[in-house]
C-alpha cells in the first residue's frame, strides 16, 4: 500500500545517496531519507511523494548508528534549516559518507571499472579549522517580517535563526540576524563576506541589485602567494583554506614547467591562471576564459600586468567553438560551475591536444559524467583527490587529473 505525505513509517536505512540522503525501501517504494545514517532503524515522516520515489525526514531514531552524534546547531533538525545536511554525522564519518557518494557516481555515471576506482584510492580529506566557523560567505534569505534567516530544505520558506554555527566568526558577530533586532525591509536577501585579510562586507540584494551597507564592494584575499582583489558578490571559495589547497593540488597534478602554454577555463578572478603564470614564466603563456562580468573585471585587475597572461571575456563553450582561443596548449584547468563542463567543452579540450587536464569539481555527478566523456575521447582519470571544503553539508570538492590513455 502506498504511503502519503505527512504519514510516518518505520524504516531500516540503507546506503548513502547524493543529496545528503540515505536510501530506504517500504512496500517496494524507494525513499530518500534525510537526518539518517546507514544501518539505522528510524521513524520517518514522508515529506514529498513523487512517481517512483518518496522523500522523508527521520523524526525519531529507534536504533542509532555508532556514527551518530548530537547536532551542535538547534536548527539542524527535521523541518528547520536545510543548509547543513550532516550535522548528525560524526566528522570522520562525514568524510567516508562523501567518499562513498563519489565512488558511487564514478561507478554509475562515469562507468569506470571497480579495479580502476580502487586504484584511485577514493577518499575525502579534511581541511584545517574544524567543522564549524569556516564559511566566509553567507547569504541569508529575508522573510515576510523582514527577518534574515536560512531556507528550509527544498523550500523557499525562511527559518529565522539567531546564529549560524558554520559561518565565519566575523560573520557571526554581525548584527544581521533577527536575534540582534535587525530588520531588512525591501531586501530579498542579505549577503555577508569575511575575507582572509580581515575585511567584512554586508550587502542587501533586491531585484538583482546588490547594495553595500557595511564595508566596501570589493574585498582582498590572500592565496597562492598573491593578494587578490575580488568583488564582494563575485565567486571566491568559501572555506578559508580552499584556495591554497586547490591551487597546490592543481599545480602538483599538472607539474607545469617554464615555457608551457596553459588554458584556465572558467577562470574567475584568476586564482589558477596566476599560479600557472608563476610556473610557466615569461616564456610561457596562460589564457584565462571567464564569462561573468565581475570575474572578468577582477581577473584584469589582478593579472592585467602579469606577463604572458591573456584574459578572454566569453563563455567557455563560445570561446572554444568560435576559436577565440587557439594555438597549441600543454595544460588545461577546468573549474566549471556545478552543472559541469559538458560534452562539447570536453571534446574541444581533448581535441586541442594538451598533455594533461586538471578538473576542479564541486558536484560528483557532473564530474563523473564529464569523466565518461573524457574516456570516450581516449582519455583516463589518472588521479583523484577529494576535499571537505563544506563540512556539515553534503557537498564535496574534487580535483581530478585527466591524461591521454
Regions found by a protein language model. Give the residues of each.
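Accessory RNA-recognition modules of RNA-modification enzymes
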Residues: 1-334, 339-347, 353
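Short loop segments at secondary-structure junctions
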Residues: 145, 403-405
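S-adenosylmethionine
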Residues: 312-396, 403
